[in-house]
Amino acid sequence: MVSNGHFASAGDDSFATSYEHGVQVVDEDKEFNRNLSKYLAYENVTPAGFNYHLISVFGSQSTGKSTLLNHLFGTHFSVMAETERRQTTKGIWMSKNKRQEPQRENSLPHVQNPNMADNILVMDVEGTDGRERGEDQDFERKSALFALATSEVLIVNIWEHQVGLYQGANMGLLKTVFEVNLQLFLKDKRSSPRSLLFFVIRDFLGTTPLQNLQNTLMQDLQRIWTSLSKPSGLEDSRIEDYFDFEFAALPHKNFQPDKFVAEVKKLTLRFREGHREPSKHNKTEGGIFLPEYHRRIPADGFAVYAEGIWDQIVNNKDLDLPTQQELLAQFRCDEISREVLVAFDEAIVPFETKQAEAAQSGNPEVLGGLGPAMKNARAKTVKGFETEASRYHKRVYQMKKAELEEKVDTRLKALFAGQLAAAHKSGISQFSDAVTAAVKAGQKKGASYDFADIVSKERKLALETFEKDAKATVVDGTSWSNYTQELALYQKDLEKISAQLRKDEMRRLATRVERWVRSRLGESVGLEFNALGSGRGGSGAPETGDKPSEDTIWDRIWSIFVDTVLDAERRFTERASSFDASLEEVDVGLWRLRRKAWGVLRSKIDEEMMEGNLLLKLRENFEDKFRYDAAGVPRIWRPTDDIEGLYTKARESTLTLIPLLSRFRLRETDTPPQLDRWVGYTPSSATPADEEDLAPIGGVDDDGMSLEEEMTMLSESKRQDLTVRFKKAADGVYVEAKRSAIGGMTQIPVYFYILLLALGWNEIVAVLRNPLYFFMLFLCAVGAFVTYQLNLWGPMIKMAEAASHQALEEGKKRLRDFLEPSEAGPHAARYKNSTEEYEMSNVKAPQRTNSGDDDDEDEGSW
């Protein structure tokens, strides 16, 4: 519904055109218009902050209040027709001063007055003493209380002839105003809210001076104030403590229209900002709008404040302006907080999302540009809140600002912590990777590298990178934006990683040294055991020096072992010094090296003492002593040699090695080396991880084994088995030697060849003299030589044997076929069986005799 000439009434959700001339704030049924904020936005008052002023006009019904406002401020409040006497303004209406506004389309032209204050809002209050409401003064009192709680200036519109009257001069209304003012002040004793009562005397004729009329009105007001029942503590208060008074007179509008317009124009100049001049006894200079009149409600919160005030009034609740101001401040601060947080979310949510996704993926990422974004977002958010909310109740504003900063800082702190965590994790990972890569690069180049220098450089770079990322994320002016603790934790973790990398590098160093020890011991100890298989002197002795004694083999092995480990310890210590390793770490490394070295030696000894290897070395040792003389010359066995004696001596000498090798004992002390002293005690700084890959050592560790058991290389059962097997091998060598001696006796004597040459001389001469025989002999000799050079004698003999065997079988078959039909068949069958039996005995014959003569006899019997 549009009433009062393009005014939006209460409850009317109209279009913007309905607000062209104003809005009904409260209707005649005491309903507040919830669209007041839309009207203020339409009139562009909302962003004005405190730069607005509110005026309310009071007066009896049909006294020309709306007419006065229309002429003063260019408004379009509905006025009463001259031919009628009835209520025109119902409820409370509001319009903005039009005298300073640019002309809108279809609007009446108004005088532009740049001297008036900005954003003057005028409330036209329903007139009093109307017949429509009669004796019902409830709305009158409520509207007065509402106007006094919200307005800076209360214009009292009276006629000149009403001055001196009680009802006609609205003294009853003014008494109500004074009463509600005391009510308001009683709730707000911390301040004295002041208001201006501006009396506009209409139809002024000039007969009675304005000063006299002013005095009359002030006397009446003093009497009313004196008659009021004042609250405790305010009995001696004066009316001037709460109100200022201004007076103006206007000629008759109808009888003196030109003069009326001129005086109205002069009156408009008073509606601008003014101030009190302390040097002139607080005399007001400038306009009537003094700072102390303003209710300090920002324009963007006025609609909510006014609605809250009216709700308290209409429900007959005690009006508590400070409480209402606080409630308004809370409401508006919450609204402003939500508004500024929208822009904050737009700037920060993308970073929060990206950080959360990176954290969920397990790869935290240092977000570029996070620091500036956090700084700008926080500064804009707080600044925007301060700009809009600082005009409200200070305590509420400070509280809400603290709440907003806490919300913002909570999210920014989480981002800050996430950024530092990402920088921490990525920095640790990059540091570890960089050190590892630098070490590998140094290893590939084959040159020595300073591990401590690498760690120091990479740690410095990691700290610089972390501090750079942290400083870039710092938000100045916040208590939580401090990364001292995180930096200390980062440094601590870097030290942990450095120590772990150093420990790993020392493990790798120990592994390399262990391989070197394994190689050296494998070669040196292998040579010592190989020397057991070279028991002969002379040409079989070492190139330099004498052949080492077999009795001192363990002494030599222990000496080699100790020297090798000492050399390895020196290498380890020198290399570890470049790691910046502590003495405790070096001690642990050396202790581990000695234990590992003993394990290497024991493994090598076990390898050499394997049954097959040791049996081979014992046989070689026996053969060197049995088959070679003291000068290292091989023996040619003859029947006259004492083979049994040499065999027994060599065998017994070799058998003495088995008990010697079965236990690791030093010759001087005839006891095992003090392995426990050599290994040393476990360092106090050793950790379980340092011991988990170490094999237990008997006599050193509490594993149940003694040092004697640790130094036992061959058990008793293995010794006995090895002795038996060696004796069998030695017996085989002895039998072979005996055969060799006997074989020398069955050789064809030399004189036989001389006799053969003498008896066959004639045949030899005949062959040499006959060219045909000689040529045939020459061809046979050449063929035999070529066959020998091509190594074909073996295949040819095998082929001849196979061919002869095949021919023999074929002949036997044909003979059987020939004899079977004849009477000689049974005899042939019996002959066949006897032949087969002979063939079997012929096969077994070589196993019964080893002499060549026996073989000749078998062939003769065949």
From Swiss-Prot:
Q: Where is the composition biased (Acidic residues)?
A: 852-862
Q: What is the lineage of its organism?
A: Eukaryota, Fungi, Dikarya, Ascomycota, Pezizomycotina
Q: Where are the transmembrane segments?
A: 748-768, 772-792
Does the entry annotate any disulfide bonds, and if so which pairs? none
Q: Does the keyword Nucleotide-binding apply?
A: yes
Query: From the Swiss-Prot or TrEMBL record, what is one GO molecular function term?
Result: GTPase activity
Q: Which residues lie on this side of the membrane: Lumenal?
A: 769-771
Query: What protein is this chain from?
Result: Protein SEY1
So where does GTP get bound?
59-66
* UniProt record similarity statement: Belongs to the TRAFAC class dynamin-like GTPase superfamily. GB1/RHD3 GTPase family. RHD3 subfamily.
Domain GB1/RHD3-type G, by residue range, is 49-306
Biological processes, Gene Ontology terms: endoplasmic reticulum membrane fusion
Give a GO cellular-component term: endoplasmic reticulum membrane
Q: How does it sit in the membrane?
A: Multi-pass membrane protein
Determine the domain of life of the protein's source: Eukaryota
What functional role does this protein have? Cooperates with the reticulon proteins and tubule-shaping DP1 family proteins to generate and maintain the structure of the tubular endoplasmic reticulum network. Has GTPase activity, which is required for its function in ER organization.
Protein localization: Endoplasmic reticulum membrane
Read off the InterPro entries from this record.
G_GB1_RHD3_dom, P-loop_NTPase, RHD3/Sey1, Sey1/RHD3-like_3HB
Q: Which residues lie on this side of the membrane: Cytoplasmic?
A: 1-747, 793-862
Q: What start and end residues bound the annotated signal peptide?
A: none
Q: Where are the annotated coiled coils located?
A: 481-507
* UniProt-listed Enzyme Commission number(s): 3.6.5.-
> Positions of the region Disordered?
819-862
